[in-house]
């Protein structure tokens, strides 16, 4: 199993990061992609990817942090992307749910990172919330130039999922699907995601699966819970968990060109 979305730089992991990584591998996780959400976090993610085996990182600016975007951001991302441990540009995209940065700032940063990914021929790791139509408008001109693209933490509708798959995007599914209320629509569309386009992730320390038993004492999510998410996804897709683990591992190897 490969976790394509771990926020290992989070302060929630500051006291026991080594233990968190050890628990993940002990649980059967074979590799992890550590996400960068701004320049500083991307630099930290790279350091952690160098520190732990079978870990890689992304370099980018999240829509929440898009107000920080500057020409220096572009230079920093390019410098990071030239490191072998950095296998994707992002996390980038649009988030019109909270608008911590204005839509204009988000679009500017997203388009700049699409250009970087296309020019460097490196996959792009994307976020989209409450911005589907505008997201596709900005993404579409770049699709032919990008070597690969993943929409991580997908929580949209079946129609939105199909629009992404039709464009060749990989779809990242988190423990959100384990929520008996909020995750129901996502659960119902799982069988319609092509197996060759499915990736799995925890988005730790966020999105702790609500159906873990026994219930954890902490609300902090960990990559060690990835096997639980995989088993639930396999159940709702009607597939064997071992087969699905092998399939999603193969997808991660194909998209990110990683060896684990």
Curated annotation (Swiss-Prot):
It is found in: Cytoplasm. It holds the Pfam family TatD_DNase. GO terms for cellular component: cytoplasm. It is an enzyme of class 3 (hydrolase). Its cofactor is Mg(2+). Its main location: cytoplasm. Its EC number is 3.1.11.-, 3.1.13.-. GO terms for molecular function: 3'-5'-RNA exonuclease activity; magnesium ion binding; single-stranded DNA 3'-5' DNA exonuclease activity. InterPro entries: DNase_TatD-rel_CS, Exonuc_TatD, Metal_Hydrolase, TatD-like, TatD-type_Hydrolase. Gene3D superfamilies: Metal-dependent hydrolases (3.20.20.140). A divalent metal cation binds at residues 91, 127, 152. Keywords: Cytoplasm, Exonuclease, Hydrolase, Magnesium, Metal-binding, Nuclease. Belongs to the metallo-dependent hydrolases superfamily. TatD-type hydrolase family. TatD subfamily. NCBIfam families: PRK10425.1. 3'-5' exonuclease that prefers single-stranded DNA and RNA. May play a role in the H(2)O(2)-induced DNA damage repair. Monomer. This is 3'-5' ssDNA/RNA exonuclease TatD. It comes from Salmonella typhimurium (strain LT2 / SGSC1412 / ATCC 700720).
